[in-house]
Amino acid sequence: MRRTFSTAATAALLGLAAGNTAQAALFAVDSGPYGNDTAGFAAWYQDSHGRVLDLCLSKALSSRVPGTPDAPSYMCALLPEPGVFDDNEDIVFPGNFPSEAFWFTADAFIQQGGINLGYGAALEAAFNTEQPVDGDQISFARIRLRVDLTSAGSYTITHPYGVEVFEVTAEDLGTDGVGAINLTRDIGIGAPGDFSGALKGDVGPFLRSVNGPYEETNPDTGTLERFVGDPNLEEQVTGSPFGTNYLRIQGPNGLDLRTELFAVSGKLSTVQRPTPLIIQRSTYSRDSDASGATLQSQDLFVQAPPPPGLASFRDSAGASVEMTEADGTGHWYGQSTAAPTTARPLRPMQRPPCPPSWSTR
């Protein structure tokens, strides 16, 4: 049996502040029209931290990890498939295109003491028929867990995008414990050509290497491209909406294993997009102190790009109120003591660096 916690419950389990309970994973997607250069898929997705990732089809190679002719060290997650996609040839749609492509991937592994845990998060482009056929294009946000275990019991897995709890039985273990935990959660699959469903998935904001961004040259175009990570390396990352930039498994007999190393892929877009700003909660409270004086406050919680960006709001009195962000997750809070009025509603504003700079928070 598996229990997946809601975003609010996840925040509570992780001990986050009340204003951090809403996860705004992805913010926007390319609305088209969609051409053959992206095989009929959306060209980009934008997350709530403001980063925009293109569908990663570049054959740029890692300058940090050498590849081989049979296994090039691509910066994008390109998956050769006999009879479908030959990565030695030009990527062309239709004709020579992978059955799966990605805007973003993040993978991590834990192998210790009989535990073999594989984790994957992805924003994926695929086809309904599992073959690259025009008119069958779909996208989805995926969370995948595969765990081999040695004993039954209750297991909690914490990852950058949530918390999963599994009650593993002897029947789940079988004879060898292989695949005792087996979870694939795909969110966002809609009608072919509708790529908006993935905005409601569990993936996002995009994880990124603390050592990035990386720049590599596209061998086909000669242009310099920027990537959020190198999928050929395992590195520390940032970007979790809960601040859980790690993979952890806890279980029976004091089991507690953890890694902070991920292999991440994603190509930063040159598309310029408006800065994301999502109002999570706005409240007004009024009371009086012992002397009878009125105490009042307007409180505003928003999701926006974290520092070095800035956020503020204009209160009902017309004054600018600077907001604060405590943990690099993009959850901002501000308070004003002005009395509310229907004639002047709160007006939040976000001021990021322009262009958005790289933050390792």
Which residues are covered by each model-predicted region?
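Non-catalytic macromolecular-recognition regions in eukaryotic signaling proteins
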Residues: 41-44, 52-62, 71-129, 292-295
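Extended low-complexity, serine/threonine- and proline-enriched intrinsically disordered segments
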Residues: 59-63, 153-188, 293-325
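Extracellular ectodomain segments of secreted/surface proteins
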Residues: 115-143, 262-301, 361
